[in-house]
């Protein structure tokens, strides 16, 4: 039975569970926290009121910021929808990209859906295999792996012809 009382200070659901851990998981709903508990991940918390596109009101983060000072890794496991992605970007901005990691749930909406479809071991692996926030303006091998493979197999693509045989054959 989850309730929000009018005028009450908003805090993360299950916030005390991250005390003493160097990492934590932030979800978008209480049921996602319970799904992670089922998968053996106890240091999971949830934003108190989900994510909305119209509001970036993260007062609850300001109220709880001290809980994150000692965290070396913060895994963001938000919903795979537009409001969830907006929440993710705002959390990255406020908490710092250097400590944030991203968990994805393939075609599933969230951690709870993933648990129902694939089971608790698969959900735990999704969290364990979370990836760092991609750096802006940095290209990694994974980003261009397909292009490199094509080049190795096929070489340079033929350039434009200008109509002068000595140049066209280069």
What is each PLM-predicted segment?
Residues 29, 80-81:
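Short beta->alpha junction loops/turns
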Residues 136-170:
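The Walker A/P-loop phosphate-binding site
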Residues 47-53, 80, 104-107:
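Short, acidic/turn-prone active-site loops that include or flank metal/cofactor-
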Residues 1-70, 88:
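Phosphate-handling DNA/RNA-contact segment within nucleic-acid enzymes
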Residues 69-72, 145-146:
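Short acidic (Asp/Glu) and glycine-rich catalytic loops that position anionic groups and cofactors
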Residues 43, 73, 99:
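Residues at the starts of beta-strands that form the adenosine-phosphate
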Residues 17-26, 86-146:
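Short, small/acidic-rich helices and loops at N termini and domain boundaries
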């Amino acid at each position: 039975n989850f309730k929000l009382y009018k005028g009450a200070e908003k805090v993360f659901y299950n916030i005390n569970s991250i005390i003493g851990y160097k990492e934590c998981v932030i979800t978008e709903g209480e049921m996602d926290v319970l799904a992670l508990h089922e998968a053996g991940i106890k240091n999971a918390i949830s934003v108190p009121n989900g994510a909305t596109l119209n509001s970036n009101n993260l007062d609850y983060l300001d109220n709880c910021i001290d809980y994150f000072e000692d965290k070396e890794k913060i895994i963001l496991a938000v919903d795979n929808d537009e409001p969830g992605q907006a929440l993710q970007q705002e959390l990255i901005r406020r908490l710092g990209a250097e400590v944030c990691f991203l968990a994805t749930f393939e075609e599933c909406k969230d951690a709870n859906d993933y648990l129902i479809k694939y089971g608790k071991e698969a959900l735990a692996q999704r969290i364990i295999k979370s990836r760092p926030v991609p750096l802006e303006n940095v290209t990694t091998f994974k980003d261009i792996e397909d292009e490199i493979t094509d080049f190795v197999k096929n070489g340079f693509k033929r350039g434009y012809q200008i109509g002068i045989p000595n140049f066209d054959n280069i």
